[in-house]
């Protein structure tokens, strides 16, 4: 093929000590990450998983020695990344009529806070060391993807192609935009990518939209 003779040049591989957001970081471009040799399982832990009515789609994240994950009941749990011991667990408060839709969402973390979303449409901020709830907002819903953290904001995308920017300190909405309405959709949305003053949202229509922040 035309590319057969093109050399692939990679920068030196680097060891990462965190994977604090889905995709590694806000830009979803962690670089050339080194994979250790002789990989082996060192611990396992369990959270409430999928069933015929609820799909577990959220991936865990790792920050400052803790692993965070949200399960299909919208419960956020922190484990010790070294040995799997549970540090704390906190279920996001949801009204009874919304509990059937609480699955979905995801988590992202900083050194001090964990931000979680759920399928009902809630965005919550919890203390990284204790799990204490700082704030919980519902800008829209449902939210089937993880949040992205950048520029002091939490960026989330809804199942119906809307993107919201919420302030990390108190959850107040800073702006929102709506993408094209698609005739059909899929379960889950990709977390927005943020870098160099731009947030990029991928919509279910297949379109990408870039917003300056």
Predicted regions and their residues:
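Short loop/turn segments that connect beta-strands within beta-propeller blades
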Residues: 80-83, 127-131, 167-171, 212-213
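Structural signature of WD-repeat beta-propellers
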Residues: 71-72, 102, 111, 118-119, ...
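Short coil/turn segments that connect the beta-strands within blades of beta-propeller domains
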Residues: 16-17, 64-65, 111-112, 151-152, ...
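Extracytoplasmic beta-rich repeat domains
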Residues: 42-61, 89-110, 133-150, 173-195
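Beta-propeller domains
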Residues: 27-44, 72-91
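Blade/loop signatures of beta-propeller domains
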Residues: 1-42
